[in-house]
């Protein structure tokens, strides 16, 4: 399965099985298209993993509970963990999660709420600055036609024609780096 993280990857928070499940979820939420642009290529799993170890650490228990419930459901109903299921069956499981009744094992918040959380984080991972672990190679920004981080635009650039640049700027180009607290820090300034 191409969307699963490779052994020895830069995962820091989730277990290998949890990461496989998140990667499979993200791949169904934002699947790869004919151009090869989707959650797997954009590295969404690495954004989610990094965020759960930093700015979103309070959500880690919810993820652990939800991922365990999802794998337990897959094993009980389809004899495989979620990540190992055929994509069509994965889609059926996601549709069941979306219903009001949902699927069991997700605690008080339910499977629908958990799925919405993962959808939100998948979107963030697709379109965040690459410094946060997702949007690898600025694929998400390229998909949207977003020109990237810029110091400023001239009045002429803001009028009429779309802004087209060969290089899509990132926070790294502006001397910013990722901070585990979830905030960008300017290198060498303490800001």
How would you label these PLM feature ranges?
Residues 2-39:
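Immediate post-signal-peptide N-terminus of mature secreted/exported proteins
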Residues 5-7, 18-24, 43-191:
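Mature-region segments of soluble proteins
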